[in-house]
Amino acid sequence: MDSSTATAMTAPFIDPTDHVNLKTDTDASENRRMGNYKPSIWNYDFLQSLATHHNIVEERHLKLAEKLKGQVKFMFGAPMEPLAKLELVDVVQRLGLNHLFETEIKEVLFSIYKDGSNGWWFDHLHATSLRFRLLRQCGLFIPQDVFKMFQNKTGELDMKLCDNVKGLLSLYEASYLGWKGENILDEAKAFATKYLKSAWENISEKWLAKRVKHALALPLHWRVPRIEARWFIEAYEQEANMNPTLLKLAKLDFNMVQSIHQKEIGELARWWVTTGLDKLAFARNNLLQSYMWSCAIASDPKFKLARETIVEIGSVLTVVDDAYDVYGSMDELDLYTSSVERWSCVEIDKLPNTLKLIFMSMFNKTNEVGLRVQHERGYNSIPTFIKAWVQQCKSYQKEARWFHGGHTPPLEEYSLNGLVSIGFPLLLITGYVAIAENEAALDKVHPLPDLLHYSSLLSRLINDIGTSPDEMARGDNLKSIHCYMNETGASEEVAREHIKGVIEENWKILNQCCFDQSQFQEPFITFNLNSVRGSHFFYEFGDGFGVTDSWTKVDMKSVLIDPIPLGEE
């Protein structure tokens, strides 16, 4: 490796003060609003170098990983108590190894589901809760009534449970898989949250205290699995009963998957800098954030097509979003939208050069993705993409009309449009196109089914909670918080708490959709869940997507850039 490459490889970030935003001819001659986004902190020379200089996994590590996989498969087949089997599944999943042991995990969970009547988990809070969570995660329905045994005569959870921190933590995590109307689980969530908050600082076992603090910050069901795996590998290493075989395999596999992701990042970065979209002063330059989101949705190496096309469509989508939000006039946006509806370039010469560039990038990339899908999957997806883009741009157009007309819609009207304008119907449809069984299956996503409706609505509301202050400062469209304030006269604090409550309720509906949506199977159900988890990652503490130099860069660097040290072997 030469010195210039070495320099690039050691500098994933750039100094934003060194960045020069290029302006187009229309920027220079017209008074347009600007997004006021800070320049990307990611060094695109470094990102491009990952295509050829990603973390190479040594041959000896590949051989060791295969050996360890065999040992873990033996663990799954060995005689053990049901609770021990559940705990093995839980650790394997949290370490990010479930993609290696899908068959073994299903066999364990189906076996435990069938044997549920023997009652080995009765009166054991941790066992009951873990069994409930893992089986529901797998799509196997367990009723909330299994927790009735922990209630007292008045129907409330017994105070004796407060002494069982491990059991309370399992109950807390299980409660987030509840459905709307499952009051026992609602009570369990409130009960466990209250007592874990009061107890965690006094927990003597450091590993358990760390898990409790982590869970209270955000429950496992709402976390991105790939990011969680990176955190859990480090946390698991500190546990007294840590299994060294699982830990070693988790580290090796994490680095092996990361190497695959890095090669993809490098290739995508090379494409992105050729588009010219990274030079637009008013728009976000967020390729790596888009990749992180695609990785949140579908990190398994076998979903390469889904990941790459989500990034390509998503990166262009972000710029289109910014064009509607802050750049285009209403007349220009109407012309842009009508051109999308016709899927035609005939009228775009009437647009300013910047919007022509954006339209052609959207048009060409979508058609390229369609051709790739035709080649790799054997069916024509372009009509599906066109429908999704039309729906997308019409939602942007409506928000622009609200803004330019000074109109604040009621929350319900805003939400129905906002669940489309957030962009996740388009991105999830992109992911679905990459895994669909055949061309006929593409009809399932139009009109928007409940699974996509509620996952997209959740992402919209979570986005609004995190981005409202920044977007209002930029002069962007109103958000759900402000619609609710205008509709009800509530304060911002009350409105924010209301939207948080709506998020919790819609998570319950989405949980149920995962069982009700018989027309969709895995992995698309998990794609939808993971898209919402990605929203929690990027927006839980602010705008971690639009503001690149935020708390998210630490996790992104640890997941996408830095391999886990393997230590002595």
Curated annotation (Swiss-Prot):
Keywords: Lyase, Magnesium, Manganese, Metal-binding. A motif (DDXXD motif) lies at residues 321-325. Its cofactor is Mg(2+); Mn(2+). It is an enzyme of class 4 (lyase). Signal peptide: none annotated. SUPFAM superfamilies: Terpenoid cyclases/Protein prenyltransferases, Terpenoid synthases. One of its GO terms (molecular function) is magnesium ion binding. The keyword Lyase applies. It holds the Pfam family Terpene_synth. Its EC number is 4.2.3.-. Mg(2+) 3 binds at residues 463, 467, 471. Mg(2+) 2 binds at residues 321, 325. One of its GO terms (biological process) is diterpenoid biosynthetic process. (2E)-geranyl diphosphate binds at residues 284, 321, 325, 460, 463. It comes from the Eukaryota. Mg(2+) 1 binds at residues 321, 325. The Asp-Asp-Xaa-Xaa-Asp/Glu (DDXXD/E) motif is important for the catalytic activity, presumably through binding to Mg(2+). The oil-deficient phenotype of this species is not due to the absence of the genes encoding enzymes for santalene biosynthesis. Catalyzes the formation of santalene. Belongs to the terpene synthase family. Tpsb subfamily. This is Probable santalene synthase. It comes from Santalum murrayanum.
